[in-house]
Amino acid sequence: MTSFSSISVIAPARLHMGFLDLSGALGRHFGSIGVALSEPVTKLVITSAKEKIVTNKRAEKCLIAFCETFNVSTNVQIEVIEAIPEHVGLGSGTQMALAVGAGLNAFYDLGLSVRDIAATMDRGLRSGIGIGVFEQGGFVVDGGRGENTITPPMLAHFDIPETWRFILVLDQRGQGLHGQQETQAFKNLPPFPRCEAERLSYLLLMQALPAIAENNLGRFGEVITELQRTVGEHFSPAQGGVFTSIDVAAAMNFLTTNGAVAIGQTSWGPTGFCLIEGDETAEKLVEQAKIIFAETPLQFKVVSARNRGGEVVVNF
């Protein structure tokens, strides 16, 4: 008999802001940067039950995988209260897996780390950003994959300045590449030039990270835009351009000309993102964008960074 009533878990969405070395020319494959968002989130509650009760298919799949690996019972109820939208570039799969795994870890008192859980759920195979934001939140950098890497190590973590605001541009009619399509797309990409991997690594280390530390939004934005342009052009044969959605591309152009910085697409999209200083400025710009793009399937949302990781709460 458990001594608690339930386990509550919150897992944050994330922006995947790009890779550093897609071909491993510098000795390690991938290497990623990204940031945790205040919303959307995946939120679920786990309670004891006499049988398996899960209405969310993705959560059920994660439950079965976890319980088979650690030889614990699937007789629990998982209520998914909120879920990050699937296949739009916000990390829904990893965050659901980590939310279910972290909740069950607490429920059964297994003492597992977030990385143990991620490896069990086959997360972090290319990027460690989803793991990093669940662990710490904020802006994170992972070191990619070496010969013996299980999950990419976290190399850097910074809190995002409180006044920075992200504008998300979501195309409600489309999804980014995922599953087998994503795997095949990576296989079909041409080699990523070593000189570009060196340049992007330099820009991150000597420009983007100092810019966050010094609250220099303009400089940070320049680097992210350049990194996104470079990686987006490399991915363009697989996704039809730097942006997956032509409507998102048009909206990002409008936002750029009206003062937004750090222009990019998260993961395979179709969601675009940018940064701007201050709530009021961001909301005004979004209101203009909503009018201009009213006849498109676009949705605009202002969010802040989440400078803390996922939450696991034992309720008594």
Q: Which residues fall in each region the model found?
A:
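DPxDG-like acidic metal-binding loop motif
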Residues: 90-114, 133-144
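Conserved glycine-rich beta-strand-loop-beta hairpin in the small C-terminal domain of fold type I
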Residues: 270
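ATP-binding N-lobe of GHMP and related small-molecule kinases
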Residues: 1-90, 105-114, 125, 307-309, ...
